[in-house]
Structures are given as structure tokens and as C-alpha cells.
Amino acid sequence: MGYDSQVRTKKRHRITVVCTNCKKRKSKCDRTKPCGTCVRLGDVDSCVYLTDSSGQPESSPSLNDADPLRKQSTPAERISPGFIKKRRSSQTRQDEDHWQRVRELENQSSLYYLPIHEETPFFIDLIPNGFYLETKRSADNLFGLFTDRAIENRDPYLQAMVTFRSIAIKKMMDKLGSNGNNVKNGSLPKSFEALSTFDADDERHISDDVVGKGNNFRMHQTIHKSLFNKFAQYRENNAKKFSSETILAKDYLPPLKILESEVLALFEEKIYNMIPIFDMKVLRHEITIFYQNIVEKGNPISIKHYDHMVFCIILLIIKICRLSVQFSKLTPYIYPVLQEIDTSKFLALVKHYLFETKVLRKCNLLQLQCLILLRFLHWCAPEDGDGPETQYCQILMGTIISSCKEMGINWYCFSHPEKYSFKINRHTRPSYDIMKPSDYISVFRKIWSYVLFWDRKMCFISGEECQIGKTLQCHFKEEADTPTWYIRMLTLDNLMKKINDTLNDDPGKVDLNLLHRLINDLKRNFHILKSLSKNEKETMRHFDFEMEWIIDLFSLSLLHGEMIFYEYDCNITKFYKSFQDLWDMVIHISEKCYNYFFNSDALEVDSLTKFYTNRIVEIVANKVLVIVPAFILRGDRFKTIQYADKKKMIEFLYGVSSVYFNEFGFEYYRCFRKMFTAKIAYKILNRSCEKDAWRIILKFLLNELKLEDNGDSYIDYNDMRLNDICPIILEFQETVQKYDGYRPDILSIWNNEFYPIGKYNDDMTGFKFQMRIKEMQEFLDMEKYSDRFNIFSSFYDHASSQLAKHTEVDTNISITNEQVAEIPQKELLQQPLAPALPVNDLIVSEFDVIEDIFDPVDFVSFF
């Protein structure tokens, strides 16, 4: 019998005594409803039994299992079709072939054997040090599980390094401030004060030697000042205030003919698919009416008639289109008129008008579309709209989601489109003449699918909990029902929501095996969707590109949390495995970043969409810079990681930093800010063999705790104490103090007593770390910037001759007591604990420790 005849053979559905899930998994079933295995694995909704020969499952209906398909085609469905009844008579032959391919692919991918150890729940703690909450003058933030701050708070090595870094900066700022050298720029945030102060001190003391510095120094100063001025101008423009009476639309908008031929044409061809929230026919109509009544006749912009919302939409579209051309790196002769439009005040104008309406009480369609465009702009623009860690996006996103629900834009526009009964008043904008109920349903669907995906996307990027708490399982026709990429992705929403729930229901008890299965299912189903749309236009490829990077980013962040859990749990074998897996993932992602910058043609991403794809690449590359120091600080724990290997890791960090900051630091405000701390981290880690960075950090922080206890610390009553900021160091101090006046080397205590996983070595497991030198080579031979200005290596590398005066501090102990013999970590791991110096010899000059990390000639110059 051939394959085709086998497929057509009708199978008899026998009555099952076990549920269909257990039958497919080949696992034990207790035959209850739902069975214990499905309850344990979180598959309660799909736990069904076949009870008759027709194969109909016996199960109570639930939200996720309910088929929201109507038995008869209604007028609303004929106008704007949505969910389809799985009936052979209602489908065309093309649709049958399409979904036959879907079912075949799904069946092939789902009938795999699941090992028993993978279906058993395995829980890990992603918040071993609790949630990270920061309060400051302007904002309070609870950082998502996968943000930089949360990762640093979870990892004891990164937490200690970041704490040391902040104290070192504060001490140097106090020294420079006491000499009256503080430099402030009112247009920049307070966090820029250290950057400006160090730079001004550097320039002040070398100004007499400008001739000797030559052209390199002049170029350095010119670029440096221009960037500071540019980012200060960003903030000044966005903070500008307006009076509605003085705003004339014609002062900001190009002529209608240019808007239609250049701006709207570019928007519709290249950008609309990224943010498909409009009916373009309706949008063009509203823009034409606005120009006729406001721009050409000179009438004031009416808030009552929502002219101001149309005005804001035009401004945002122009600004987004200009960003598209700006970041495409194409010749300036493309779209020349668009590039000449001054968009610097556009964002301030939009913010002015948005709050002229009762945005926190009610919303209409134009206002919602304006809010979504603003959210999109915050994501793409070089200004700091979302914050350096996307921590400022949830309030605007929450406003958008609440407005959608208030307006009836929700799952009902897919599950019950025929149930919508409209009353469109005569003064509604857009008017009934141009926008009928069927058009509303169509736009509602586009908006909901877009907002829903962005809500899920932020969970994968930052680990924050989704704000939309409901999901449905969807199937659509191939052509008629998937006009946008976001609607097609609705078929993945159920999986993405399950991943969110598994991660955020209890971050202290996350089922890792379930999360891995869900991620694998998501990858597989996404691959199926991609394979079914190979004929898609090139303009859609950036969406698939972003989705792949989002999944990789989630996997990277989860791997780091997994490694930290095994380390705390002293699970030696799994710690070594996750250490290697995380490093391999870092290398893999770094290679992808390199190809994005230097081999972008192979990625088949339209250059006019790079203003959008740059954002996810920037977030992923930054995550690599955050995680790599964790490997370097832990390197001495592994016998197979020699000093030469650590130097390769440091070279790799330098290479990735150079690529990241040279490609993004000149344009993106948030990247420019991060260069300050990234340069310090590099200086901390780039030490000689006898000056182990981790030993110095521990020594410094223990000393700082002692100074706090003696009342000699720099911290005043308004600051949190070190034992509150980094409690693990306080616990370590208590362990050190148990040695009754004598102590072994502090690294020996850390590795063997306080953090006991360190007393095990890789000989016990046969683990051999794989450095992947071949894959790292592009970053080790960083010649891309040898013939031009390297912003990461060049900025702040001119020393102040007065640094010694700033860092000289009296000490109460002799130099001989300060010069503790430095024993390499490799030897410490193999030696028993032995008495050494008195505990009180931990009290050393804080600036001596700083100078032990930063060379005197470049401490002030670090960026």
C-alpha cells in the first residue's frame, strides 16, 4: 500500500482509558479528569479522553480549547472574515492544501519521544537575591527578570563588580568636587555629571600641551564635545514647551504634494508593515482634509475636532520616515527633501497635544493610533524614549492596552466579529462616509494583533510580565485572514503566553524543563510559519529576523539564570555544563552581531528597515557586554582556563565593546551613556596575572565595610549603606571574621567556605572548557577600526598629570602591611586553609585599592 493510500485510510478511533496527552507522551496516566501527570505538567486544558468511535474528546469547554468559529457565515464574517470553521465545504482547494501542509508539519514535529527526565518538573530560582527595585527622584522602577540590573543583582560576581564601580566613581567625584572641578550641564541628566567632570579635568590639565598631542587629540576633543552637545540637544528639544495659540502647522509640515509623493509613499511601501494600524485610504483622506482646512486656509488647529491628533500623526510619520532614511546609510540623494525637514521639535509638539486631551480618561481611534506611533518611535529613535533597559515603556504600553480594551479592541474582534453593533455618530472622526463598521473591524484586528505581539515581545526581551492576560488558539486562512505579519503570529500567542506564565507566576520557582519544552515548541512552530511564507515579499523579512533574535535573547538570559542557580545550589556537573552552554550562546550571538554589521547583505534585511532592526541588535549586543565579565571573574575556578585564556576573554570583551560602541555609540543616546561604565568594567578586568581583579574587588569592598563601621566612609546619611546595597559582602565579612584574628587569603575563604562550589575543580567531572577561539577570531583581531577613530578605545584616554594629588590618601598602616603577597588563584584552589595576616590588616587606603586596578595615568580618563 502506498503512502497516499495510507493517508486516505480512515482510522477507527478506539475508546481510550488514558488521556490523549499521556498516550502521546507514553507516560503513566492515573485516568482521572484531569490526570495527575497533566496537572503536574500544566496541560490541564488539553487533558482529554476519547470516549466514542467518532473520536470526539470528552472534556468540558475552556477558553483555550473553545472553537470560536461560527457555524454559519454571517454578514460580518463575509465582510471581514476571521476565525474559520474547520469544514471541508467552507474552504477552497488552496486553503485545504495549505492547512494539510500545516497539519503534516505539526504531526511530524509533535510525535517525538520525550525523555522522562525532561517531562519531570525541575524548578530553579531566578531571584536568589530578590527582585531589583530602584527608587530615585524622577522614577521608581521594578526591573524585569532579564534586564541588566536584574542580571547583575542575580549574579554575585557582577553585583560586587558593579558596587565597586559605583563607589570608585563616587570617591573620585568627591575628590574632584572638593577642588571645585565639578561640571554640570543642565540639559543632561545627573548621571552625566561624572562624565563631564572627568573630561573637563582631563582637558584642563593638558591644555598647555595641545600642540604636542597633534591631530589625534584635536579630533578626540571635537568628536567628544559634539556628542555631548548632540545628546544635550536631544533632551532640550524634547523638553521644549509650546502654546497652542502660537503653533502654525505650516511652519512644521512640508507641502501636501511632497508629503504624499515622498513621505507617505515611503511609509506605505517600507514602514507600514511594521506598524499596520491604519486603513491607508482613510489616513490619506484625513491628511488631505487637514491640509485643506488647516494648512492651506490657515485655520487654527482645533482640539475639539481632533485636528491636533491628525497633526501629531503626520509629525510622527515624518519623523519615523526620516529615521528610516537616516539609518539606512544610503546616499543622501535618496529622499533629499525628507532629509531636509527639521524634525527636532516634533516629539515635543506631540507630547504637548497628547496631554491637551483627556488621555487618562477616554480615547478615540485617532488618539490611540497616535499613542501607538509614539510607542513605536520610542523603540526606534536614538533618543532615550524607553530608557537604557526598556524600563520606561510599560506605562505608555499600559495606557495603550487600557485604551484598546475601553474601545472594544480585544480578542472579540477575532472570536466574535459578528457580535459588534456600531453606532457611529455624525461628528466621529473618521466619519461614517469614509469608515464603515467593517472597516472598523479590520482596523481593530490590525491594532489588537500589533499591540498583543508587542506585549509578548517585551516579556521575551526584559522578562517583564505580560499586561494582556488572555490568549486564544487561532487558525486563519493563508491569504484572506492574514493581511499582516502580526495577525499571522497570533497562532503563536498561546505558546508565548504560556512561556510568560511559567516565567512570571513564581520567579522563585520556575519549571525549567517546561520552559525548555515551550521554547522548543515556539521555535518549531515559528519555523513552520516561516516555511509556509517563503514567497513573502522581502519587505517582511525583518520581522522574522527580529523574532529569531528575540528568542535567542530569551535563551541567553535564561541560561545565565540557570547557571547562577546551579552555582548557588552546588550542582557541579550542571554548573559546568551551563557555564559552557552560556559561553557558546554568547559566542553564537556575537557572531550574529558581527554579521549584522559587516555582512548585512547576507541577512537579506532591507537597509530602510535597519532603524527598526537596530534596536533588537543593540539590546542583544549589550547583553553580551553585561554577561562576559561574569566569565572573566569566574575564570580562575577552572583548571582548564589558564591566564592566557582569560586574556583572550578580555580581548573578546574589547572587540565586542569596540563594535557595539562604534556602530551605535555615535547615534544612540542610551549606548553613549553605557560607555562610561563599560570602559570601567574593561579597566577592572584587564589586569596582569598577579593582580587578580576579583581579589582586589573583594579586598576593596571588605575595606569599605570596615570604614562604614568606623564612621569613616564617604557615604552620608542620605545614602544607602554598603551592607544594604550588596548584602552578600556583609555575609562574606562575617565569614572572614570567624578566623579569630588570623585568616587565609580572602579568595580561599570565598571559594572554599563562603561559596563552596569553588572548592570543586573540573578534574572531578572531567570537564574541559571549550574557548571557541575560531569563532571568536573576528573580535580578537579587531582591525575594523584601525584606520579610523575607535570611540571605545580613544575616549578619555588622555591622562591628567594631577591624578596622583587626587588619589593620595593618608594611611594608618605601614607600606609593608599593605603589600600583601598576591598568590595566583590556581594555587589557592589546591592548598588547604592556613593562617596568614591579622584580620584588621584588611583596613587599607581605599585609594590604594583603586590605584591597584586603574593605572594612575588613566583613572580620571576612564569613560
From Swiss-Prot:
Keywords: Cytoplasm, DNA-binding, Metal-binding, Mitochondrion, Nucleus, Repressor, Transcription, Transcription regulation, Zinc. Residues 52-99 are annotated as: Disordered. This is Oleate activated transcription factor 3. Residues 52-63 have a biased composition (Polar residues). Present with 149 molecules/cell in log phase SD medium. Belongs to the OAF3 family. One of its GO terms (biological process) is cellular response to oleic acid. One of its GO terms (cellular component) is cytoplasm. Residues 18-47 bind DNA. The keyword Nucleotidyltransferase does not apply. GO terms for molecular function: DNA binding; DNA-binding transcription factor activity, RNA polymerase II-specific; zinc ion binding. Its main location: cytoplasm. It is found in: Cytoplasm; Nucleus; Mitochondrion. The keyword Cytoplasm applies. InterPro entries: OAF3, Zn2-C6_fun-type_DNA-bd_sf, Zn2Cys6_DnaBD. Transcriptional inhibitor with a significantly increased number of target genes in response to oleate. It comes from Saccharomyces cerevisiae (strain ATCC 204508 / S288c). The gene is OAF3.
